[in-house]
């Protein structure tokens, strides 16, 4: 399971990154968060995006999906998992209750979409 990790830099400032279930740095996410730091993401934005992307990365790990091979239905499954919890439960409610507020789900999706926009632009500039 990926997690957002607070990091204290040499100059004493605090920032956030994402580590995977093997405690390794998630390089594509770190590149995006570093870009955010360079364009002056506020510290709370960096933290919120790191937490959101850690949830996304955990979802990808559980589903065995590579971050650069996602399909549209993967985003739908992620949104559903955020709203209603685990999808693999043998017990299904007829009317599941949301586990996160709409604004939190929207924040998570905003972070994920921003991450993919960054990746698309970054790849364009390299090619």
Where do the model's predicted regions map?
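N-terminal DNA-binding module of tyrosine recombinases/phage integrases
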Residues: 2-39
